[in-house]
Structure formats: C-alpha cells, structure tokens
C-alpha cells in the first residue's frame, strides 16, 4: 500500500470517528468544525505516519491498519481532552477532564503525570505482549483471541473510572467493551497474529461498533456527558447528513474488505 492509499484509509477512518461525536453532541453544544476536522486530520496524519515510519502498510492487512487508526485517533483525542484541554467542566454532566470520584482534577502537574504514566504504561504493555508472544514455543488460538480482547478491558476500566462516580457502576456497560473487543479479535486474528497489534486493532473496532450503537440505536438517548443538560440546538438536517456519512464509511470499509479478498489494493 502506498502513502496515498494509507492517507485514503486514514481519511475514511477520520470521517467515521468525526460523525458519531458531531451527531451526539451537536444538539447540546452546536456543530463545531474544529472538533469535526480534528478527527479527520488526525486519522489521515496517523495513517500517513504509519506508512512513512513503519512497514505496517506492507506487512499488515488494510483492515488491520484501519483498526489501528481508530485506536490511535481515539487515544490521542481522549488523552488530549482528559489531560490537556482547558474548558468549562460545568458544561458537562460527567467531567471530561481527568477526574477523581466524579470531580475534575484541576492540578496541571497531577494531570500531566497521570497522562505520561498512561502513555508509558501502554508502551510497556505492548512490549510485554510482544515479549511473551515470542517466548512461547507456539501461539494457541485461544490465547491470541483473549489477548486481542485486552483493549476492551482497558477501555472499560477507563470508562468506569470516569462515568461510575456519576452514573453508578453498570456491570453490563463495563463488560460490553471486553466482550465486543474479544468478538472482533476472532476474525481479526486471521489477519494478524501479532498480539499487541491485534489488541490495539480489536480495541479500535470495538470502540467504532459501540459508538455506532450508542449514537444511532438507543432511541435518541442523550450521551452521558450531557445527560442532565438541555438540547438547545435543533440540527435535524445536519444529523441526517452525519448519519448518511457514518453509514457510508461502514460501507466503504466493507468494500475495502471485499476488494482485498480479491488481491492487494491498487493504491
């Protein structure tokens, strides 16, 4: 796959992640071009960065690249919102900034220390998975699939830390990410057997699947972060456009899967 091909995959992935945030949040805070374009630019930038700095676009299936872009874009965006961004937390029912027992942590030193620790921890976890994989004489399929679900467990832990002090702990909500990530790991394990890459990729597709469900299949329920806030913007036409775009991105991904079944992508 060329750099152009990677950029196109990144564009598709970035457009996809941009749709669910804009669809859910626009009735409460209006449509923000900066937030929308952030995901698009990040998706393309991450995909191009992968193509330029690694051999993954040669070694890995395009669908795996898409899953990795989902993960890295979401990690970058959520890390920025949790650690770096300075905005009025009273606008949210659930604070978006790093919190403790439901209250935002305003101390910059603490937030940045936690932010760095999260990055280092993820790097160590990926390195440990790779080391453990290479140390085994063989890689049982069941072990590969279970490792592939680790991204879902990490997502669940982060979500519970943020949401549970406000909403209460929901076992169903907590288990949703691990179960779906593990389910994604089953087909993805036929495309890559690298444990770290599989866990990252399955975690990304788990987020995309859950966000699709929460955005379009919950009967218009407001996102948790705005649960007690009024919807002050009427944007039905915009939301219809975003829904079509979101569906189109899933269709585009299906086309990529079908095309690669016939041979390498032409770009």
What are these regions (language model features)?
Residues 5-25, 150-159:
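N-terminal signal-anchor/start-transfer transmembrane helix
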Residues 110-126, 240-264:
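Final/C-terminal transmembrane alpha-helix of multipass membrane proteins
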Residues 29-40, 92-108, 168-179, 226-242:
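Membrane-interface segments at loop-to-transmembrane junctions
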Residues 68-78, 151-155, 202-213:
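Alpha-helical transmembrane segments and their membrane-interface exit regions
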Residues 1-5, 23-33, 53-65, 129-146, ...:
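Membrane-helix interface and helix-disruption motif detector
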Residues 95-168:
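Generic multipass alpha-helical transmembrane bundles of integral membrane proteins
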């Amino acid at each position: 796959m060329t750099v152009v091909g990677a950029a196109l995959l990144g564009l598709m992935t970035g457009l996809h992640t941009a749709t669910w945030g804009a669809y859910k949040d626009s009735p409460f805070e209006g449509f923000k071009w900066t937030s929308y374009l952030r995901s698009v630019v990040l998706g393309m930038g991450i995909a191009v960065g992968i193509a330029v700095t690694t051999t993954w676009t040669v070694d890995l299936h395009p669908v795996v690249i898409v899953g990795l872009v989902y993960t890295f874009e979401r990690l970058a965006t959520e890390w920025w919102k949790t650690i770096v961004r300075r905005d009025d937390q009273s606008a949210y029912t659930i604070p978006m900034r790093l919190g403790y027992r439901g209250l935002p942590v305003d101390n910059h030193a603490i937030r940045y220390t936690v932010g760095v620790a999260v990055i280092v921890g993820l790097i160590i976890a990926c390195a440990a998975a790779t080391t453990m994989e290479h140390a085994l004489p063989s890689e049982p399929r069941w072990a590969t699939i279970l490792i592939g679900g680790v991204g879902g467990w990490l997502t669940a832990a982060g979500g519970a830390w943020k949401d549970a002090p406000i909403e209460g702990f929901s076992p169903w909500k907590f288990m949703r990410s691990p179960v779906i990530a593990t389910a994604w790991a089953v087909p993805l394990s036929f495309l890559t057997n690298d444990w770290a890459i599989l866990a990252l990729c399955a975690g990304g597709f788990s987020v995309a699947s859950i966000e699709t469900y929460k955005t379009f299949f919950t009967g218009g329920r407001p996102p948790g972060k705005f649960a007690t806030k009024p919807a002050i913007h009427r944007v039905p036409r915009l939301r219809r456009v975003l829904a079509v775009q979101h569906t189109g991105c899933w269709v585009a991904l299906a086309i990529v899967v079908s095309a690669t079944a016939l041979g390498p992508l032409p770009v």
